Amino acid sequence: MPQQFEQPQAQQAATQEDDALATTQAAAQTESTDQADVLDDILDDIESALETNAEEYVNSFVQKGGE
C-alpha cells in the first residue's frame, strides 16, 4: 500500500520543480529582453551623435598633448 502513495507525491514534486524552472526561465528571459532594450537605446544614442557631428564625437575620446 505505501507504494501507491509514493508515486503521486513524486509526480507532485516533479510538477513543482517544473513550475519553478518555468518561472525562473521566464524571469531570465524578461531580464535578457530588458538588457537588450537598454543596449539598443545606447546604440541609438551613439548613432544619433555620429549622424549629427561625427568629428566632435570622435574628438571627445582623443587625448590632446599629454592629457
Curated annotation (Swiss-Prot):
Pfam families: Pup (PF05639). Residues 23-61 are annotated as: ARC ATPase binding. InterPro entries: Ubiquitin-like_Pup. The keyword Nucleotide-binding does not apply. One of its GO terms (biological process) is proteasomal protein catabolic process. Signal peptide: none annotated. Residues 1-36 are annotated as: Disordered. One of its GO terms (molecular function) is proteasome binding. Keywords: Isopeptide bond, Ubl conjugation pathway. The keyword Nuclease does not apply. Pathway: Protein degradation; proteasomal Pup-dependent pathway. There is a cross-link at residue 67 (Isoglutamyl lysine isopeptide (Glu-Lys) (interchain with K-? in acceptor proteins)). It comes from the Bacteria. Strongly interacts with the proteasome-associated ATPase ARC through a hydrophobic interface; the interacting region of Pup lies in its C-terminal half. There is one Pup binding site per ARC hexamer ring. Protein modifier that is covalently attached to lysine residues of substrate proteins, thereby targeting them for proteasomal degradation. The tagging system is termed pupylation. This is Prokaryotic ubiquitin-like protein Pup. The lineage of its organism: Bacteria, Bacillati, Actinomycetota, Actinomycetes, Bifidobacteriales. The gene is pup.
